[in-house]
């Protein structure tokens, strides 16, 4: 695993979300506040909360304590209350700043190939490695970028007519 390849994706996520969401005049499903079905607003809030409480803090736990200190459980639904009253553009700015700081921190950590094998203890999944945590960070981003795209596509479900057969994003 090459950290440069991971940071390249991590750096691009804010740009990608900005391109999709910033300044939309008609904001379909930007936040539904529903634990079962997240809109783009919910996703960006979740990503901010992850920047603050998940990826870098957990990497530090692994580097400093190994698997002797379990990770603090992550509240996957904290964004519903935390970001009420904010605009999408505010959240995008917050995410951009938090991500830039975390990518810089990740670089400053100077993680070695050997350190990627260090183990931590996830409260639900059990033993995980630092390399797995960092790879998950990237795939987590991509998963949520896809979720945002789905949230933007869904309002057009009925309007596409029979072309829906060629648009699997509408069936997820």
Question: What positions do the PLM features span?
Answer:
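Acidic/histidine-rich alpha-helical segments that form the ligand environment
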Residues: 76-118, 128, 132-140, 147
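Non-transmembrane alpha-helical segments in soluble domains
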Residues: 7, 18-21, 44, 48, ...
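N-terminal start-of-chain detector that recognizes signal peptides
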Residues: 2-4, 15-17, 32-34, 65-66, ...
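Short amphipathic alpha-helical/adjacent loop interface patches that line ligand
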Residues: 10, 14, 99, 141
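Short acidic/polar alpha-helix capping motifs at helix-coil junctions
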Residues: 6-9, 21-23, 66-67, 83-84, ...
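Alpha-helical bundle segments that constitute or directly flank the non-heme di-iron/ferroxidase center
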Residues: 1-28, 49-61
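Short, contiguous alpha-helical
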Residues: 27-74, 117-172
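Amphipathic, non-membrane alpha-helical segments in soluble helical-bundle scaffolds
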Residues: 3-11, 37, 41, 88-92, ...
């Amino acid at each position: 695993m090459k950290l440069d390849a991971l940071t390249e994706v991590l750096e691009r996520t804010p740009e990608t979300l900005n391109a999709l969401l910033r300044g939309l005049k008609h904001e379909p499903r930007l936040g539904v506040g529903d634990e079962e079905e997240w809109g783009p607003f919910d996703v960006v809030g979740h990503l901010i909360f992850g920047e603050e409480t998940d990826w870098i803090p957990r990497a530090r736990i692994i580097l400093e304590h190994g698997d002797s200190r379990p990770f603090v459980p992550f509240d996957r639904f904290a964004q519903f209350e935390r970001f009420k009253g904010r605009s999408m553009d505010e959240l995008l700015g917050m995410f951009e700043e938090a991500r830039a700081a975390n990518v810089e921190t990740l670089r400053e950590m100077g993680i070695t190939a050997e350190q990627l094998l260090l183990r931590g203890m996830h409260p639900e999944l059990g033993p995980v490695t630092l390399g797995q945590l960092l790879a998950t960070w990237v795939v987590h981003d991509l998963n949520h970028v896809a979720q945002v795209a789905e949230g933007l596509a869904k309002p057009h479900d009925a309007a596409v007519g029979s072309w829906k057969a060629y648009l699997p994003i509408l069936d997820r």
